[in-house]
UniProtKB/Swiss-Prot annotation:
GO process terms (BP): rRNA base methylation; tRNA methylation
Binding, S-adenosyl-L-methionine: G173, E174, S205, S228, L229, H230, N304
Catalytic reaction(s) noted: adenosine(2503) in 23S rRNA + 2 reduced [2Fe-2S]-[ferredoxin] + 2 S-adenosyl-L-methionine = 2-methyladenosine(2503) in 23S rRNA + 5'-deoxyadenosine + L-methionine + 2 oxidized [2Fe-2S]-[ferredoxin] + S-adenosyl-L-homocysteine; adenosine(37) in tRNA + 2 reduced [2Fe-2S]-[ferredoxin] + 2 S-adenosyl-L-methionine = 2-methyladenosine(37) in tRNA + 5'-deoxyadenosine + L-methionine + 2 oxidized [2Fe-2S]-[ferredoxin] + S-adenosyl-L-homocysteine
Organism: Sulfurovum sp. (strain NBC37-1)
Miscellaneous note of the record: Reaction proceeds by a ping-pong mechanism involving intermediate methylation of a conserved cysteine residue.
Cofactor(s) listed in the protein's UniProt record: [4Fe-4S] cluster
Official protein name in the record: Dual-specificity RNA methyltransferase RlmN
Role noted for this protein: Specifically methylates position 2 of adenine 2503 in 23S rRNA and position 2 of adenine 37 in tRNAs. m2A2503 modification seems to play a crucial role in the proofreading step occurring at the peptidyl transferase center and thus would serve to optimize ribosomal fidelity.
Active site positions, chain numbering: E90 (proton acceptor), C347 (s-methylcysteine intermediate)
EC number(s) from the headed UniProt entry: 2.1.1.192
Length: 359
């Protein structure tokens, strides 16, 4: 799918308005892109034909091509997208079902969508437990390529423009290693005349690039921060996550303490639980001490096995013991329900696919 055209989704609303005159035309284009999910400029019939032709000559509306869609029994959907240069990335649509309990005893069921998107082709971090790392790093995604993942998923699932959607930058790649493009995509997602996904519905997950955490904080984007911690001492963390050699636990904790968090929010610490590696109560004790004084919540994640790994999934009993130790001592802690296991769409299972022979 070769192209040398610019990606129009790389432009913010303001940047598009600077290039397209008069102003109402840029608003029409923005509406076609993010509300009507246009696949081509030719569809934009309320634009003059000459303008449609000029746009088509300079820009593409289709920087990604859907290669495969896999459906999970739990309602999740995994997308494999091909980029213009032949590389591929994956994104996942998660259907979350919440229950609201009312005083009269009634229960209201609500469905909401969370989309897990990628920020890079591959990843440099090289975590021992992550399948994405096995393929190495290829390149960063542009803001438009990040944005297009969500746009295509919303269109494919007929998700209304005003439907509540949460975004998690937890797909392929280290988001803070591509901070400028990720930050720009956050702003594009939040545009009120576009997708209107407020920053507090967007979560950026990082392996702990402390200097970039500080930079992200200074940007004042208003996004949620999630730290992929996974170990409570530097020795084990460096075995699991080689990047710990450059960004150790102490530097991460310092950066988190300086990160701006509003009164109703907490920094999420993600802790991937691996059987007989980091799942005992002594680790829970150290974690409690480590997060003392931080507005934190802990998200325990089951390790999701894949072919060739030596790591094992922990038992449900051990997960609950770990959780109970923390919650009884005042630390907010949840166990993440694994989604998309049957289609390899769960945490740590995304990777770039070779288009011949693997799909």
């Amino acid at each position: 799918m070769p192209t040398h055209k610019k990606i129009i989704q790389d432009l913010t609303k303001e940047e598009l308005a600077e290039k397209i005159k008069p102003a109402f035309r840029s608003k029409q284009i923005y509406d076609w892109i993010y509300h009507k999910y246009a696949a081509s400029f030719e569809e934009m019939k309320n634009l003059p034909k000459a303008m449609r032709e000029e746009l088509d000559a300079e820009y593409t509306l289709a920087p990604l091509k859907t290669v495969t869609v896999q459906d999970s029994m739990d309602g999740s959907r995994k997308y494999l997208f091909e980029l213009h240069d032949g590389h591929t990335v994956e994104a996942v649509l998660l259907l979350m079902r919440d229950k609201e309990y009312h005083e009269d005893g009634s229960v209201k069921h609500q469905e909401r969508y969370t989309v897990c998107i990628s920020s890079q082709v591959g990843c440099k971090v090289g975590c021992a437990f992550c399948l994405t790392a096995k393929g190495g790093f290829m390149r960063n995604l542009t803001a438009g390529e990040i944005v297009e993942q969500l746009r295509m998923i919303k269109k494919d699932n007929d998700i209304a423009a005003n439907r509540r959607v949460n975004i998690v930058f937890m797909g392929m790649g280290e988001p803070l290693d591509n901070l400028e493009a990720v930050a720009k995509s956050v702003k594009i997602f939040a545009e009120e005349e576009g997708m209107a996904i407020a920053p507090h519905r967007q979560t950026i997950s990082t392996s702990g690039l402390s200097s970039k955490i500080e930079k992200l904080g200074k940007m004042e984007l208003g996004v949620n921060l999630a730290i992929s911690l996974h170990a409570v001492d530097d020795e084990l963390r460096q075995q699991l996550m080689p990047i710990n050699k450059a960004y150790n636990i102490e530097s991460i904790i310092t950066a988190v303490k300086n990160f701006p968090v509003n009164d109703r929010k907490r920094v999420m610490f993600e802790y991937l639980v691996i059987k007989d590696v980091n799942d005992d109560i002594s680790a829970a004790k150290k974690l409690l001490s480590l997060l003392d004084g931080i507005k934190a919540k802990v998200n325990l994640i089951y390790f999701n096995p894949y072919g060739g790994t030596e790591f094992k999934r922990p038992s449900e009993a051990d997960m609950k013991k770990f959780q109970e130790y923390l919650t009884k001592r005042g630390l907010h802690c949840t166990i993440r329900e694994s989604k998309g296991l049957d289609i390899s769409a769960a945490c740590g299972q995304l990777r770039e696919q070779e288009l011949e022979g693997e799909i």
